[in-house]
Amino acid sequence: MIRHAHLVGFGLAGALLMHQLQKRGVRVTVNDRVDPQSSSHVAAGMITPITGQRVKPTWRGQELQEFARRTYAELEHDLGISLWKDWSLVRVFRTDTMRT
């Protein structure tokens, strides 16, 4: 059994990994470089079940979104803060060709 883990990077992925490890009793230390241009700061943890120009559902997107909802709800409870917000997506097509 792993007793200690050291994470390099504490963006969204690092924070979620730390949470999962700590749930399993692993002591975690972290090194992180503060970068305001990192994807964790720029995209703010955005999750979308669709991808690509054709706006198709992501492979296993629904399953992953359900896992994310459960994980974020657990973190919200543990930390006493709000982390999850549902947003609507509006896709504007300039031409009929873009619509198909």
Regions inferred by a protein language model and the residue ranges of each:
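Accessory recognition modules or surfaces
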Residues: 1-3, 38-39, 43
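Short beta-strand/turn micro-motifs composed of small residues
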Residues: 9, 32, 93
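Beta1/beta-strand and adjacent pyrophosphate-binding region of the FAD-binding site
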Residues: 1-13
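Glycine-rich FAD pyrophosphate-binding loop
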Residues: 22-41
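Dinucleotide-binding Rossmann-like beta1-alpha1 core, especially the glycine-rich loop
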Residues: 46-100
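Short polar catalytic/cofactor-binding loops
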Residues: 10-12, 35, 52
